[in-house]
Amino acid sequence: EYQVRDLPQALIWANEEAARKLLGQSPVPAYTNDIRMVMTPDLAVWKKIYQHQLDSYEDSPDLQTLSAHYKGLSENHLLQIIGHELAHWSDLFLDDFADYDANIWFEEGMVEYISRQYFLTEEEFAQERFCNQLLVDLFQEKHGWHSLDTFGKSTYEGDYASIFYEYWRSFLTIDQLVEKVGSVQALFETYHKWAQSDQSISLLNWFVQEELLEKEI
């Protein structure tokens, strides 16, 4: 359905330290490149990482809601993370692993959306969307707004709140677009329509110009 024809040559289960430092230099212990996929399959580790998004915010009812949500994550979320990484291998994306700064928000948002739809229950999907919006609002209230087009390799130089902020905005943007065009397949078709244009404006601005998005999140 999503044209995932090729798969990583290796799927490596690793503890948090190995996944983050020894194998990929990544602050998030799940990633894919053109050879392998690496992931820490420990739910407790992921609960801890997601909780770290909240470290710089003062206690509030919203923060308590978010903390309770992440403490209660099910093993479906581990499957969703695996699905997220495998969905990167879809041939429907136009860029390869070397082009990480080229409209990467779209690919990251799509693989997050697809994997959540596939592995999470309807209730879990809705709760993730709700919590993502809370986190985006908290981040923007504290740090201000910037365009999603800045999502790129430099994103990973920040703390967990700033890293996941870009992922959650990407997901929420894709969620709006899918609702507008009707399906994931229709959104891929729209994406390919932009690719066949002169690409004089970014994909994100093109969605706004085509009135598929009212404005950036």
Residue ranges and their predicted role:
Residues E1-S60, S67-H77:
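Auxiliary, metal-adjacent structural segments of Zn-dependent hydrolase domains
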Residues Q3-A14, A102, E128-R129, L187-T190:
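Surface-exposed patches in mature extracellular/periplasmic domains of secreted proteins
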Residues Y70, H88-Y100:
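A long, hydrophobic alpha-helical segment
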Residues E75, L79, G83, N103, ...:
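Hydrophobic (often cysteine-bearing) scaffold residues that line and stabilize catalytic clefts
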Residues L79-L86, L138-D149:
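A structural motif
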Residues Q80-F93, E112, R116:
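Active-site recognition of the HExxH zinc-binding catalytic motif
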